[in-house]
Structure formats: structure tokens, C-alpha cells
Amino acid sequence: LPYCAEQGKGVFVIDTFYQARISPEGLLFDGTFFQDPRLRQELLFLQKIPARKAMSELFRVKSDSLLWLLGRRWMAENMAVALEYSYFPAEWIPDFSQELCKIPWERLFAQRHMPPSRVEQTVQGICVYGQEALLLQIQEGSGAFLANQQLLAENHRVLRYSKILAQARKVTHYLKDPISK
């Protein structure tokens, strides 16, 4: 089924998310999305940053803690399909490296005795500008999907917080709800 989203007085039906023919379910960005053999990642940056108040509260760590910030671009058939910005406390995986970036998040945290139980995510449509438009290989002001995602442990502790920008392709707008009564 295509992904549907209400927008104003109409319903947008997104027939295909990516020209690279990745399934709409991929927008969930779960472990299966990142293990898709059609995808390859390009590391943009990997750095430690100080945790701001909101992030230290989100991860339940001290306010002077450091976070890993990972930026990467996901490519399929030489086309950018998504940008990922992920945060997690550096004290949980102090030896995080470019090599460990290749391991799916679920497996990485499970190896560190912090098995994830679920992913919570909100998705909204946005317009992309500047560096992010360049990295996604789209025109400034083009539409994209922004997924705010949290990987949670069984005790509801947030293990990883990510912002994922994904290209939207081939959108059809219906002026009337096709499921009208």
C-alpha cells in the first residue's frame, strides 16, 4: 500500500518514496532498511559534542556528558535517498568508530548489553535548503520527509535519537479523501 498523509484539506498519496525503488516501508528506517543491499552509506562526520540540556534529559545522563554525533548519507543506485543525524551518549560506546558505523543500531546496542525493544518515530513533510539539499541532490525548497526517531530499550530509556531526512518522489495529491463516506 502507498503511504498516505493528510495535508490541509486533501490527502497526499506517495506512490514511491525513492527513484531507487526502495519500498515505502523503508521510511520506518528500521534495521531492515539499513541492511538493504541496494543501500550504501557515506560517512559525513563522526564527532563528540557536549550534551545540551534537552539531550541530557532525553538520554538521562549528566549535563556535562558527551554525545556521539554521526552524520551519514544513504545512497542507492548512486542517488542520495536519505541523510541521517544520530546522537547517543559517548559513555555507552566510548570506542565508537567509523568501522562500528557499519553495524545496524539494534545489533550494536545489543552487543553492549543494551538490547533495544522498539523504535518510536514521527514523520512530517518539510522543505529542504542549503547543504542538506545539496547532499540529497535535490533543488532548494524541494519537499522531503523528516523522521524524528528514538530507539528505546525495554525500560523505555532512549538509546539513540536520530533525525532522518528522506527524499520524497512522485507525489499525487487528491483534492478529496478517496475513502469518503
Whereabouts are the PLM-identified features?
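A short glycine-rich, His/Asp/Glu-containing loop-to-beta-strand
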Residues: 39-44, 70, 76, 80-86, ...
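C-terminal regulatory/effector modules of DNA-binding transcriptional regulators
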Residues: 60-63, 76-79, 88-92, 97-181
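HTH-adjacent hinge/linker in prokaryotic transcriptional regulators
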Residues: 1-64, 94-118, 172-181
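Exposed, interaction-prone assembly regions rather than primary DNA-binding/catalytic cores
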Residues: 58-61, 66, 71-72, 84
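Residue-level recognition of beta-strand microenvironments
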Residues: 46-48, 73, 150
